[in-house]
Amino acid sequence: MAALHPPKHETFDVPAGTNTDPKGFVRQVETYRTADFGLYMDRSADHKEFSRLESWLLPDFGLRVSIFHYRAGHERDQHLYLDIGEFTGPDNDGRWHAEDWYLDLIDRPGRGLELEDVDELLDAHAAWLLPVDRAEAAVHIATRTMVGAASHGNDVQAWLAAEGAELTWSPR
């Protein structure tokens, strides 16, 4: 179980070409791309387990869909990692913003989406760190996403494409 914490916030500063993570670290972004349905980001990562991070912020879905490019020896069987929360942008300065609402969905090939961190959501709500409307919205987003993926052969990208959000990724 993770330590109790308020919702994590992240900033995607498209004009500056930077991404400020929840800990306040500012990182250069190699690629930002906007679509009618969201914002794509591709950046290198100075992390011991992964070297690159690709993400789509999908405001209408309440999702951030990511691919972590893991380093040798740290590979995982997951394909996509989905954060649930509030994703907005662009603001008047061209920045996008993310507020993570604790719940995550893991997409592993050949299996249904796996819901994680329910305990974090409940603990945060009990500690008044996440209001009831956002906690409830997180559960609805997770449910809609899991049902949508299941209705498309456990393929979350196929479901998103059918809903008008066709995700494209770096060919790396």
Residue ranges: model-predicted function:
Residues 1-53:
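Charge-rich, low-complexity N-terminal segments
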Residues 39-93:
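The feature represents the first ordered module of a protein
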Residues 77-129:
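Conserved, surface-exposed functional patches that form binding/active-site neighborhoods
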Residues 1-7, 113-114, 121-123, 128-143:
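Compact, glycine/acidic-enriched structural inserts
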Residues 31-34, 57, 106-107:
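Well-ordered beta-strand positions
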Residues 22-30, 62-68, 102-103:
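Short small/polar-residue motifs
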Residues 74-78, 119-121, 139-143, 150-154:
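Low-complexity, flexible helical/coil segments
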Residues 141-172:
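Cysteine/selenocysteine-centered motifs that mediate thiol-based redox chemistry or coordinate metal-sulfur cofactors
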